[in-house]
Regions:
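Beta-propeller domains
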Residues: 1-180
Length: 180
C-alpha cells in the first residue's frame, strides 16, 4: 500500500473538454523493475526478500525511492517527492520524469532527502504566497549530528530564503504556519 511506485496524474479543462493524463515516476527502482519484469528492491515497509526467496539479509535497510508521497507544482516546475530520497523532476506538460534533482527551483539541496510535506504560506505582506519545504538527513549513530535545511520560494519559483542547521537530535517540521 505505502510501497507502491509514484503515479502522477493531471486533470484539466480545455475549451470545455476534460483531459486526463498520468505517468509513473521514472525512479531508478521503477525503471529497473520494469526492465526486469519483477520486483528487485524493497520499499520502506517491505520485509523479506523482494524476489520472494526465503533467504535475505534482515539487516539490509536499503529501500528504493518510490517518489509516491507528494507532488509540488510551483514556479513552472513539477517535482514528485518521497521522504527518504531526492525529489524527481518531471515535465509539467507530459509528466515524463527528467531525473533525480540535486536542486529544487534554484536551491541546491543541503542534504539528499527532501521532505514530501511542504506548505504554502502567506508572505509577509499577505498578497503573495510562499512555498516552504525542508530537507533532512537523520544520522543513526549516537554521536553524529543530524542535518536539516529549510527553504522558501516566491510564487514565481525564485529562491527567497534558506536556513541550514543541525545538531544532536535536531529534528523539525512545518506545522500550520509555524516552524518547530
Amino acid at each position: 500500500f505505502f510501497d507502491g511506485d509514484g503515479l502522477v496524474y493531471a486533470v484539466a479543462f480545455d475549451n470545455g473538454e476534460l483531459t486526463f493524463k498520468h505517468n509513473f515516476v521514472g525512479t531508478k527502482g521503477f525503471t529497473d523493475e520494469q526492465a526486469a519484469k519483477q520486483m528487485l528492491y524493497k520499499g520502506a515497509f517491505a520485509i523479506g526478500n523482494p524476489k520472494g526467496d526465503a533467504f535475505y539479509n534482515p539487516f539490509d535497510f536499503d529501500v528504493k525511492n518510490v517518489a509516491n508521497t507528494g507532488v509540488v507544482d510551483w514556479g513552472g516546475e513539477l517535482y514528485a517527492l518521497w521522504e527518504g530520497g531526492k525529489p524527481h523532476k518531471m515535465d509539467p506538460t507530459t509528466l515524463r520524469t527528467e531525473g533525480e534533482a540535486d536542486s529544487v527551483l534554484g536551491h541546491d539541496l543541503e542534504v539528499p532527502q527532501m521532505a514530501a510535506h511542504y506548505r504554502v504560506l502567506d508572505a509577509d505582506d499577505q498578497t503573495k504566497k510562499r512555498l516552504v519545504a525542508f530537507s533532512i538527513e537523520a544520522q543513526n549513530a549516537p554521536l553524529q549530528a543530524n542535518k536539516c535545511c529549510f527553504y522558501e520560494w516566491d510564487a514565481d519559483g525564485t529562491p527567497a530564503a534558506r536556513a541550514p542547521f543541525g545538531g544532536q537530535n535536531a529534528t523539525g517540521g512545518i506545522f500550520h504556519h509555524s516552524l518547530a
